[in-house]
Structures are given as structure tokens and as C-alpha cells.
Amino acid sequence: MDTQNTPVHIKLWHRDFWRLCFANLLLMSSVYMLIAAIPYFLILEKYQLWQIGCVLLSYGLGLFLFGGFCSYLVQRYRRNMVCQLSILGVVVCLSVLYYLDTFWNIKFSFEVLLAVRFLLGAFLGLAQMSLASTLVIDSCESFQRTEANYITSWFARFSVAVGPLVACFVYIYFGMEYVFPTASVLALGAFVLVSRAKFPFKAPAEGIKVFSL
């Protein structure tokens, strides 16, 4: 078994690093696809502009929910499992409202929409922290970490363009109602890529506080 100090990859651009970079791209693109989709559907449901703004804002606030607990979670539990479960949380948040509304005709209140968007932001924030700050770092050697962080951040920036472009393509050729399922598929793709990546063994640190800034 590899230890924490065992050199695993000499080159940065190895298979697992590619998987993590594209997982980051798919995950962030799935969320950026909703930039146009959420206002579109909320306007159809006759929501007021301030309500639409609050729904969008709740996502941003949710990003910070697990920030103080991330260090404890990745040390207490397997770091790749923390990331994978967080991504599954994103998938559930992307899917639940769409499928219940489309197939079961269940309408949700404004408060429930706020809660789901808040949870979406919370799960995405934890997935991003565990992916970009932990898994990517652990997949490369110490002298490559600055370059790895730089590359990963550019994949995330690229998703700002990819997400809305994919949403526009889906809207033009299939309809806006397919944007949410497509976003869920992209997030599932990120889950598969992370689950396929391999990481060296890392002993958990001792004395980690449950909450830390």
C-alpha cells in the first residue's frame, strides 16, 4: 500500500488528475446551467422579481454552510467519499424539484425553493472544497501542487462558459424543461470520474476541531 510520502505520479498530467479536472468541469457546469433556467421557470410560475432574487441568493449563502466543517469531515471520513456524497447531494437537489413537479405535479412553496437552493449551494461548496483543496492536492507530488491548483481553477473558470452554452444548446434543440435533467447527468458524470480516481493512503490527522476557520 502506498504511504503518504510514496511518490505515485512523476508527471502531473496523469489519468487520475485528468479525471479530477473534468469532474470539476462537469460539476461546476451543471450548476452554471441553472443561471438562465431558474429565472425562466420562476417567471412562468408568476414569482415576483424579489422572490427570484432571494432564490438565487440562497444558493450563494449555502456555499458557506460546510466551510468550517470541511477539514474535520475530510479527516474524520474518507476524503473521496466526502466529495462523492456531496456530489450526490447536488444531483438530488438538481433533480427533486424537477421530477416531482413534472411527473407528480407537486408544486413547492417559495420557502421550499429557498431551502433546496440553499442545500444545493451547501453540497456544491463541500464538493468543491474536498475536490479542489484535497483530492487534487493528494493526487500529485508536493512540488506540483501550485501548478495543479492553477490548472484546476482554470477548469472551474471554463465551466462558467460551458454551463450556459450547454443550457442554450439544450433549450434550442430540446426545450428548457430538459436543462435540469441534463445538469443532473453532468453532475453524475463528475461523481463517476471522482469514484474512478485513485488516491494514496493518508493517515488522518489528530486533534482536528469539528469547526475551524
Regions found by a protein language model. Give the residues of each.
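Helix-loop boundary and gating motifs at the non-cytosolic
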Residues: P7-G60
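C-terminal ends and interior cores of transmembrane alpha-helices
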Residues: L88-K107
